[in-house]
Amino acid sequence: MIKLSIEEKMFPDRVIISDFNISIQKNEFVVITGASGAGKSTLLNIIGLIDTSYHGRYILDGVDVSGIDYKRQLYLRGSYFGYIFQDSLINEKQTILRNLLSVIELKKQKEYHCVILNELEKTGLHGISPETSAALLSGGEKQRVALARALLRKPKILLADEPTASLDNDNKIKIMDILLDYHSHGGTVIMVTHDTNLITNDMRIISF
């Protein structure tokens, strides 16, 4: 599914990744661990086509996506990937519903209402009205809204960058249960984390 070879990825002051190769198969749960500043999040951004400023080659589902134009990059990003980050990136000035609809084309938003309710139920938010202001949610609830948003378009690959870092144990378990459920239904997960307690035997570990 993914074959990525990074010859060099530069930051203004240093090389952050060099001579790195990775292959990821469909329906793998891959965990990327390592010290802070080692380039884990940068790698995730490269995989997710957020960052294309590196020297190397990237094959996604048999297609070379190295150096693709911006329009094609956006299309593949939306077609393949869902994202969840340590910061939920939820707009607190909007309702839960509006946050979720923000990733859906305007002309398709009406047909997604039932899908949204289903995703909220999957993420344990069915007891909260979709019209609730995001500002009223706890940190764990915001992260579950972010995860529901990431899963809304049925991504083939879910990228999770420290998704439980700022959460209490109960919410960590809830987030991991959702990721594991997505994986059990055929999804591919690539997760960056410092928390080794989240790792199970069926996950593949890549140390940076």
Segments the model singles out, each with a brief description of its role:
Residues 154:
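Conserved catalytic motifs of ABC-family nucleotide-binding domains
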Residues 168:
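ABC-family nucleotide-binding domains
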Residues 158-161:
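Catalytic Walker B motif of ABC-type/P-loop ATPase nucleotide-binding domains
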Residues 87, 94-106:
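Q-loop/switch helix immediately C-terminal to the Walker
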Residues 64, 111-129:
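Conserved ABC ATPase "signature" region
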Residues 133-137, 141:
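Conserved ABC ATPase signature
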Residues 65-82:
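ABC ATPase NBD coupling module
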